[in-house]
Regions:
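Bacterial Sec-dependent N-terminal signal peptides
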Residues: 1-27
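Intrinsic-disorder/low-complexity accessory segments
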Residues: 20-122, 126-137, 141-147, 201, ...
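Short, conserved secondary-structure transition motifs
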Residues: 148-162, 703, 712
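Short, solvent-exposed turn/loop segments enriched in Gly/Ser/Thr/Pro and often Arg
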Residues: 151-155, 166, 229-236, 670
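Aromatic- and acidic-residue-enriched segments that line the glycan-binding/catalytic groove
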Residues: 160-177
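Substrate-binding/catalytic cleft of secreted carbohydrate-active enzymes
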Residues: 176, 192, 259, 279-280
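Core alpha/beta catalytic barrel or barrel-like domain that forms the active/cofactor pocket
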Residues: 180-205, 226-242, 304-306
Length: 825
């Protein structure tokens, strides 16, 4: 009788959920996996789940995409836990020292499941809906000591781009032949977001709105386990943890070992179903900006799960083994691994909390403080990034600090001031500080999935010291007061940073004429280096209220202009000198479409629209031959393969335009298009083979044998000709991020503005011995005059993932300053 009563109580407890909560298939009216679900429908389903289970599910809308789609998470747990959600969250942060408060025990485990960061890996969002349904209807016991956070789609814009294309293109019933059009996405594909960024490389750099809003809520929760759901090629069945080497050295033994336990539990369910899978291959834990590494460096068990499929798979496709891979298969596998991971959290909640807290204890790292010096704009930009990640920083006292000096790669010292920045590893997020700031991350295996160098001082163009002692620092509350402009002959703004370029962009769009100096300018004993912006009243007489208009723009962009009372300088040049030139209004064409790298195009598109705030005309390569080139004076070519674009006729028209004064800015792979014509002055530098070496490498060792030819995202020092307009705002050296082993000879008849000299070595990251030899005497950035115009070569992409902040001024200089020989209205 007692057992019957108990069963009745349990049944009554479940009945309200079963009566109200619909499965995804019931809600949509079609079997889940028989169609792709659009994002608004996914949001509708999660709202249905939350309204049906108000005591167990809470939705949080944490932002909107560029195309105004909702970004959201669902927090799922037991009724008791949901009642105490805020105290549980705060206890978790207090236990790791992020917030004040007593440390507590018996806290629930927190699992965060992230789906569909790559839009065309579309099965995982479908799986997210089935996962939340099964958690609530079948796994209530797990929720008693586990909080599950589900983000059903990290990239709604990219996913809907894919889903809408597929729904418009696919046959009914679907066609499993890979030759069918439904298995071949058009450019740019659904993988990236609106601005064509790979959001799974953006976690640490937070350049995109999706990332910025997500990491805010992520750091508010700080989960113990994080799973990033992906898809891979149709012939690669399923990958789950444990990860492959290299592991970053800060990853603890517990993090390594528990990945194995999770993997074994996943394997148990896959084995029961006879599903294929692999582990410990390909996907490592090193580069910090992934959806597995960022959480790992924030203390979690961070993992990538990869299902066969990707954008090619559609609703069903035959793989190379003749097996049909369906969307139902794909979402079922992801649902299974996600639930198996939650199960492991439920079984190990106490240990997860305990080890998670240990991760945030102070570590005895070699370098305990990083001291950074640079312009206020650069320091402020870095502060903004650190604040997004919840990393603490301060200002030092006026002292001399000795340690590893980034600019020389040797021991050195700097004298600090309150305008400098100190970031210490003695803080809860000290592990992430080490990862982001250390000069050269220790690499256990040179075969990696991504770049091997990213050190923030190099990326941000800051002088830095890594000190072995902790440097005392304090908080500085500063607010820069911009002196209002008074009437003067003219005004000067020094040229050092992207913020100066934003100011210039605003001036030009306000039709204010601006000059720049090609030689040092001395006024009232102050030297203004080349590239300084000179705005005179005489050039802008058409503006009736010129001073107030200029002051308004200067205040908006926080620029303190220096007034000049006369055009007569201390020494030449004077303001009216031919060496002080009016800046042309750039009329920029930016190529997109087939042949261009969507990622490279996206970096440029985002830069012009969201950072520089300067309008460009985007031209699809299919329309290249119809372009009226007289409408433009600058052509920006993203990295890509332009063989089918630059046909003989198209190349002839491009040459004619350049010779009449046009500028081409060719980035990375775009430079290939100019290597087959001697008039462009560009030649590859290839390895000189003095003696033919027989190929005796075994089949098994082929990949590893090629590592001596590889450069996997390493940082090198270049020599810079700072007198050239392309390098205005830089000193005599620049640290470049090399992404591969393609090299170009020094220009014979042009200008080698940044180049790698002899006896080079990487300051950070991996480069094979043979690849290093071939780097000597190679051009990184250069200008090749061509008639009245020129070609500007940027062989290392300064816009890469928009995180290499110190390279952006080269692109800006190419547009505004290089070959600015005649002013055009």
């Amino acid at each position: 009788m007692r057992l019957l009563s108990l069963l009745l109580i349990v049944a009554l407890g479940i009945l309200p959920i079963q009566a109200q909560l619909k499965s995804p298939s019931q809600f949509f009216g079609y079997e889940l996996g028989s169609e792709f679900t659009r994002h608004y429908e996914v949001v509708d389903y999660f709202e249905h789940v939350a309204s049906s289970n108000k005591n167990q599910v809470k939705l949080e809308y944490y932002g909107k995409t560029n195309e105004r789609r909702d970004l959201m998470i669902a927090v799922i747990s037991s009724e008791e836990n949901v009642k105490n959600l805020e105290s549980i969250r705060n206890n978790n942060l207090a236990n790791i020292g992020i917030t004040d408060g007593d440390k507590t025990k018996n806290n629930p485990a927190i699992v965060w499941l992230s789906y569909n960061v790559h839009g065309n890996e579309a099965s995982s969002t479908e799986a997210s809906m089935l996962t939340i349904y099964k958690l609530l209807t079948e796994k209530q016991e797990w929720l008693k000591n586990t909080i599950v956070i589900i983000d059903p789609c990290l990239n709604p814009d990219g996913r809907d781009r894919y889903v809408n294309w597929f729904n418009e293109t696919a046959s009914k019933p679907y066609n499993t032949s890979r030759q069918a059009s439904e298995h071949s996405e058009p450019w740019p594909g659904g993988r990236p977001n609106h601005y064509l960024f790979d959001l799974n490389r953006d976690w640490a750099w937070a350049t995109q709105i999706e990332t910025q809003t997500r990491i805010k809520v992520y750091n508010k929760w700080m989960p113990h386990i994080h799973v990033d759901f992906h898809e891979q090629g149709i012939n690669e069945p399923y990958y789950f943890a444990p990860a492959a080497e290299p592991f970053h050295e800060i990853i603890t033994d517990w993090q390594r070992d528990f990945q194995i336990e999770i993997g074994k539990n996943n394997a148990k369910y896959f084995d029961e179903n006879g599903w294929l899978y692999f582990t410990r291959e390909r996907f490592d834990l090193f580069y910090p900006s992934y959806g597995d590494t960022y959480p790992t460096y924030m203390g979690a068990i961070g993992m990538t799960y990869e299902q066969a499929g990707h954008g090619m798979a559609g609703l069903g496709i035959l793989n190379d083994e003749g097996v049909e891979l369906t969307l139902v298969d794909r979402l079922t596998h992801h649902t299974t691994s996600g639930l198996a991971t939650v199960e492991m959290a439920h079984k190990n909640a106490e240990k997860l909390n305990e080890e998670f807290a240990k991760f945030f204890n102070n570590k005895n790292f070699k370098y305990k403080s990083y001291i950074l010096q640079g312009s206020k704009d650069k320091i402020d930009r870095l502060k903004s990034l650190l604040l997004q990640h919840g990393i603490k920083f301060g200002s030092p006292k006026n002292i001399k600090v000795t340690g590893y000096k980034y600019s020389t790669g040797t021991q050195g010292s700097i004298n600090t001031s309150a305008s400098d920045l100190v970031v210490s590893t003695n803080q809860p997020k000290g592990n992430m500080v080490k990862v982001l700031f250390e000069p050269n991350a220790k690499l256990s295996d040179s075969l990696t999935y991504d770049i091997t160098a990213w050190s923030i001082p190099y990326a941000h163009g800051l002088e830095a010291i890594a000190a072995t002692q902790e440097i005392e620092h304090f908080e500085v509350l500063e607010r820069l007061y911009i002196e209002p402009l008074k009437d003067a002959y003219g005004y000067i703004n020094k040229w050092n940073d992207l913020e100066d370029a934003k100011f210039l962009s605003a001036l030009l769009q306000a039709n204010i004429r601006v000059r720049f100096n090609e030689k040092p300018l001395i006024q009232k004993g102050i030297t203004y280096q080349p590239g300084s912006l000179i705005i005179t009243k005489g050039d802008n007489q058409k503006h009736k209220d010129f001073v107030n208009k200029l002051d308004s723009i200067a205040q908006e962009y926080r620029r303190q202009l220096s007034p000049i009372s006369s055009g007569f300088s201390d020494v030449t040049p004077d303001i009216g000198s031919p060496d002080i030139k009016l800046i042309n209004q750039p009329k920029i064409a930016l190529l997109s479409g087939d042949g261009t790298s969507s990622l490279s195009f996206g970096e440029l598109w985002h830069f012009f629209e969201k950072q520089l705030n300067f309008q460009v005309t985007v031209i699809h390569t299919n329309h290249f031959r119809n372009v009226n080139w007289s409408d433009f004076n600058v052509l920006v070519m993203p990295s890509g393969y332009y063989g089918s674009v630059l046909t003989e006729d198209n190349l002839k028209s491009l040459k004619d335009w350049i010779s009449k004064g046009g500028k081409v800015v060719a980035i990375d792979g775009a430079m290939r298009a100019f290597t087959n014509d001697d008039s462009f002055g560009l030649q590859y530098k290839t390895k000189e083979e003095t003696e033919k070496t027989p190929n005796l490498t075994t089949y098994a060792n082929q990949e590893r044998a090629n590592t001596n030819q590889m450069i996997t995202g390493a940082i090198f020092k270049t020599t810079v000709d700072a007198t050239h307009p392309l390098a205005f705002g830089y000193g005599d050296q620049y640290f470049t991020l090399k992404l591969g082993n393609t090299n170009y000879k020094l220009l014979d008849s042009g200008y080698n503005v940044a180049y790698i000299d002899n006896n080079t070595k990487p300051f950070s990251g991996f480069a094979g011995s043979e690849a290093i030899k071939n780097l000597n005497q190679t051009m990184i950035f250069g200008e090749q005059p061509y008639g009245r115009g020129s070609l500007i070569y940027l062989s290392d992409n300064p816009m890469f993932r928009s995180f290499w902040e110190n390279g952006k001024l080269f692109l800006i200089n190419a547009i505004f300053f290089v070959n600015n020989n005649s002013f055009t209205l």
